[in-house]
């Protein structure tokens, strides 16, 4: 096999399983083995997608969900990054913050929904708050972990060359912690959509989650499947975006350089 063919095969490999599942799904539906009352056929899902797209309803819900996700991630990610930096750079910061953050991290989002509705109602603030809360913790943990696992030899070497304070942070500590921070970004982006699903299915009047719950009330399983697939694709898009940022910001890192060479 030529190098070019092998390269294209490796790029297509992640899609073999999804395509195989869809083909099996279509075969089971067309032969009657899988009832449409249980799961609509892929053809029916595509028809529902085109119908929602043509009416513009799908894009309205998608735009609203995307806006909530981006705003919530921006707020929660920024707070998590800031708290992680404080806790990672300062022993006193860790003593003050870490225990409280870890306790809050273990509280399920579903348990907070009654309080969130009481505090914010069912407007946008409630959904954004839940998304921000969900994305805060992975950013905090990975930022703290990245700073605490920096090679101390590099820090001492930088200090011997006269770096200290902000210069030491910018040139040594932040670049050293960045790989772990980017892992936090990828994890937070995944939790962003998971949290939004919870928020939109319980306390919303718009968005992809609301579309799915509304379709469930009328037994429109094809629309429910469209919403599920959309969430999966949005999650994949967020992960691909995070990978692109990793490649762009970590070109200096030998591990990422080796990955690009293999790709």
Positions of PLM-derived features:
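Transmembrane-helix boundary motif in ABC transporter permease subunits
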Residues: 71-101
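C-terminal transmembrane helix and the adjacent membrane-cytosol boundary/short C-terminal tail
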Residues: 91, 148, 179, 183, ...
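Transmembrane alpha-helices
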Residues: 129, 133, 166-198, 222-225, ...
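Short cytoplasmic-facing helical segments at TM-TM junctions of multi-pass membrane proteins
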Residues: 99, 142, 146-184, 212
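Glycine-rich helix-loop "coupling/hinge" segments at transmembrane-helix boundaries
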Residues: 117-118, 147, 194-231, 250-260
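Generic hydrophobic transmembrane alpha-helix motif, especially the helices
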Residues: 102-138, 145-146
């Amino acid at each position: 096999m030529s190098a070019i063919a092998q390269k294209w095969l490796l790029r297509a490999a992640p899609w073999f399983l999804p395509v195989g599942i869809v083909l099996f799904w279509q075969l089971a539906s067309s032969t009657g083995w899988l009832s449409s009352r249980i799961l609509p056929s892929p053809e029916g899902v595509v028809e529902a997608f085109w119908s929602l797209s043509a009416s513009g309803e799908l894009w309205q819900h998608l735009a609203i969900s995307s806006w909530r996700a981006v705003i919530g991630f921006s707020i929660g990610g920024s707070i998590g990054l800031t708290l992680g930096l404080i806790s990672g750079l300062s022993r006193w910061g860790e003593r003050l913050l870490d225990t409280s953050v870890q306790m809050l991290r273990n509280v399920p989002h579903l348990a907070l929904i009654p309080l969130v509705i009481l505090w914010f109602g069912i407007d946008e603030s409630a959904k954004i708050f839940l998304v921000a809360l969900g994305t805060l913790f992975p950013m905090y943990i990975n930022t703290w972990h990245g700073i605490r696992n920096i090679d101390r030899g590099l820090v001492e070497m930088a200090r011997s060359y006269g770096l200290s304070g902000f210069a030491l942070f910018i040139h040594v500590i932040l670049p050293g912690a960045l790989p772990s921070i980017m892992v936090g970004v990828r994890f937070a982006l995944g939790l962003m959509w998971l949290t939004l699903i919870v928020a939109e299915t319980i306390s919303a009047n718009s968005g992809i989650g609301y579309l799915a719950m509304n379709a469930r009330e009328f037994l429109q399983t094809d629309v429910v499947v469209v919403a599920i697939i959309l969430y999966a694709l949005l999650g994949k898009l967020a992960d691909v975006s995070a990978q692109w940022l990793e490649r762009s910001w970590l070109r200096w890192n030998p591990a990422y350089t080796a990955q690009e060479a293999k790709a």
